Amino acid sequence: AGKSRILELFSEEYGAQVIQADLVARQLEEPGQPGLTGLVSLFGDGILQADGTLDRKRFAEQIFENPEALKRVNSLIHPLTWNEIKRQIRESSAELVVVEAALFDKCSREVCRYLLYVDTQDEIRIQRLMANRGYTREKCIHIMQNQADRKQFTELADFVIDNSGTVESAEIQIR
């Protein structure tokens, strides 16, 4: 949806500290971290590479088509991630902290004063994913089908930023 550019605007224009939940979760899935330890407890050593790191490709294939496995992963990783985000916010000296997370959940409301949703028309999202990540159209559609629908996000959000247009248009909405 073009979230990266929106995050850059908050950081560059408003001096915000940006915390990306996906990066926090990845750090928690490194060797010796509680996320990886928990995943191994749930799924066994078969999810590890020879060097002890998570075999992300194999693990993703294992859980992507298995809703129950994905639910178990989320129930482990999400609370760990939000606890780490809360710690980073407490220790931040920035006046504004922006947390980027793919999903809104109970923890989002507990941690964040406002929830913003960056929305983009589906076809523009597909074009951006194909250009920026090299995905096929089919993979983009599959990813989008597995995400909560736009209506859910817009109802939960305090503010919606339409990022279908230019960077300048998004900037005006942020101000």
Q: What function would you assign to each model-found segment?
A:
Residues 84-85, 93, 110-111, 131, ...:
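Small-molecule kinase domains that catalyze NTP-dependent phosphoryl transfer to phosphate-bearing small molecules
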Residues 1:
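ATP-binding Walker
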Residues 22, 73, 98, 105, ...:
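Residue-level signal for inorganic ion chemistry
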Residues 16-30:
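Short beta-strand-centered segment that lines the nucleotide-binding/catalytic pocket of NTP-utilizing
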Residues 83-91, 96-132:
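ATP-dependent NMP and nucleoside kinases share a basic, alpha-helical "lid"
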Residues 4:
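Walker A/P-loop
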Residues 26-93:
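ATP-dependent small-molecule kinase phosphotransfer cores
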